[in-house]
């Protein structure tokens, strides 16, 4: 049983090792000029200064193509796959074995909806497959819905699921800040400060 959960965590990415990049400090003696020798000043080289390892050139992200003209304060944000272009994708899987289930989790990680048709699979394997994908969906904050006999819909958190009867799963909207009512009365603490000053 523990083996199934560890495989699920490995696939979803909860057990991924964090890799840190370490840089060696280099003496940048080429960047300093000898300030005490004024007799033979050397002209500055025409080529660009050597890059310091600590500072890298900014990398382009998927969102740079769309928002090239706008400069935002959050320049280090990397776009989610599928979020920039606004195109939603649905992956229909009809697996024959349990070994095909990681494809469904990977699609959910890429913010794609998954329709899982398990009519071909053995009932015990189908139950195991639904449990596996449901666990991955829960770990990714997604939603699941049974839409037929052995047919299931798994969606990422950015997808709203609804039927003719109403909304089954609604995408949470960020709470709007309530506007402060304009107060005509001065605050009570302001009067006390004036009394203290007198």
From Swiss-Prot:
A GO CC annotation given for this chain: cytoplasm
Annotated segments matching region Disordered: 170-198
InterPro entries registered for this protein in UniProt: Cell_div_SepF, Cell_div_SepF/SepF-rel, SepF-like_sf
Pfam families xref list: SepF
Location within or outside the cell: Cytoplasm
GO-annotated biological processes: division septum assembly; FtsZ-dependent cytokinesis
Gene3D superfamilies on file: SepF-like protein
Keywords of the record: Cell cycle, Cell division, Cytoplasm, Septation
Biased composition annotated in UniProt, kind: Low complexity: 179-188
HAMAP family, A to Z: SepF
Family, as annotated: Belongs to the SepF family.
Subunit architecture: Homodimer. Interacts with FtsZ.
Family matches, as PANTHER family: CELL DIVISION PROTEIN SEPF (PTHR35798:SF1)
Function: Cell division protein that is part of the divisome complex and is recruited early to the Z-ring. Probably stimulates Z-ring formation, perhaps through the cross-linking of FtsZ protofilaments. Its function overlaps with FtsA.
Name this protein carries in UniProt: Cell division protein SepF
Chain's gene name: sepF
